[in-house]
Curated annotation (Swiss-Prot):
Ranges of compositional bias, category Basic residues: 13-23
Functional summary from the UniProt entry: Meiosis-specific cyclin. Required for normal homolog synapsis and recombination in early to mid-prophase 1.
GO cellular component, one term: cyclin-dependent protein kinase holoenzyme complex
Family of the protein in this entry: Belongs to the cyclin family.
GO molecular function terms attached to this record: cyclin-dependent protein serine/threonine kinase regulator activity
Organism phylogeny: Eukaryota, Viridiplantae, Streptophyta, Embryophyta, Tracheophyta
Gene name of this polypeptide: SDS
InterPro entries named among the record's database cross-references: Cyclin, Cyclin-like_dom, Cyclin-like_sf, Cyclin_A/B-like, Cyclin_C-dom, Cyclin_N, Cyclins_cyclin-box
Amino acid composition bias (Basic and acidic residues), ranges on this chain: 79-88
Composition bias type Acidic residues, residue spans: 155-164
Gene Ontology biological process terms, A to Z: cell division; G1/S transition of mitotic cell cycle; homologous chromosome pairing at meiosis; homologous chromosome segregation
Gene3D superfamilies per the UniProt record, alphabetical: Cyclin-like (1.10.472.10)
One Pfam match: Cyclin_N
Protein name: Cyclin-SDS-like
Organism of provenance: Oryza sativa subsp. japonica (Rice)
Amino acid sequence: MPPTMLASVPTRPRSHPFRRRRGAAAAAPPLLPDQIAAAAAAAAKRPAESSTSASSCFHSEVISATSTTCPTSLAAAQRPEKRPRYQDVDEEQPAASECSEIIGGARPRAAEVEVSESSCLASVLESYLACPEQLANDAETTAYSSAREDLTLSETEEEEEEEEVRSGPCICTDCSFSPLHESSSSSDDDNAVPSPTFSLFLALAEQFVPFTHPKTPTATDVALQAGEGKRFEDLDNEVSYERFRRRERRGVVARDYIEVYSSMLGSYGRAVVEQRVVMVNWIMEHSQAMKLQPETVFMGIGLMDRFLTRGYVKGSRNLQLLGIACTTLATRIEENQPYNCILQKAFKVGINTYSRSEVVAMEWLVQEVLDFQCFVTTTHHFLWFYLKAANADDRVEDLAKYLALLSLLDHKHLSFWPSTVAAAVVALACLATNNESSCHLVMETHMRTKNDDLPECLMSLEWLTNYAS
């Protein structure tokens, strides 16, 4: 029995009061009535104790005192008072953690479990992976996750969703934000002060202008033909390739928004075109300095282009902030530890410096505008498939990846699907290295739709051959 546990209360006296033990001394002389009364008064003055040893001693005193004088009350005195099975609610109970330290194996109470879980969660949130900025006034949170939806879609659901892909221009006149943004104006607590980052997010959201131009050149959206084109020999590669081809058309419109901004009145449209080139160069230089993966570069530029396709934020400073936020957001998504941690407190583009709070606020706006659908296919995802179809060597592979990066500088590739741009880049790399047979294999693998625009894409990217030497 552990030393901290109380001894059980005996259900009967240890020995009969009238039975003398063998070899024991003679019984003590009986007490007088005055002695009995004095013993009872002394016992009444003692404080009540929960210990079993004290009660048993008092019990033995009363039994020994009344054994010779009060035989009628002997039976009642012999019965010890039953101890309640459950302790009183108001009685203080020892913590489970204290008992477990002494006796071990004790199960903690629910309250202690909640405290321990909250403390563990707090320690996790203080890690490098978590952003120190927290959203204020978040009355509601949505359980929708586009990334989880993409990962759990079955092939049947993908085929059904393929029919609902938008092939026309993205008219964002009814652009609405999530309940997170709406809760800022309808919060129950009027005295709550939002954090500085959340205040910046609200200011950027007010400056956002949805893209409303109805006529923009878009890529044709035609369903993939089952019997068209050359297939991969490996079934897994074929299934993955077809899935990427369907996914690139899900909720994304391929169009050149630069022509629309160029036709806008005023100088802001021209500023968008100029700042895009500046930020694409900055993203490439930043990725090279931070040793980021090529996937991060393509995703960062892709997020910026998709944002500008749906709208823009007024001010050239905000355009640079948009490029930084898209890069940091892509870094969080694509990079492994510890490179996915954004530890910089300031970002500098030219002579302009941007704080971490500004970048995080723009990250929130980018996710709001894109409906939190940041996991999209890029040109880099298709390079592997076409290089494998062409049986390319290291020289062709390095040249194709280099030309793919250069294609990001030109806005003309935005009018084509990422798979078309990747096929055109690999085909140009094959032609530059005198591998015409490999070029035909790439074109046969890609052209699985009627009226495919791969020839037009090759002509628009023909300037890349000047950098192939």
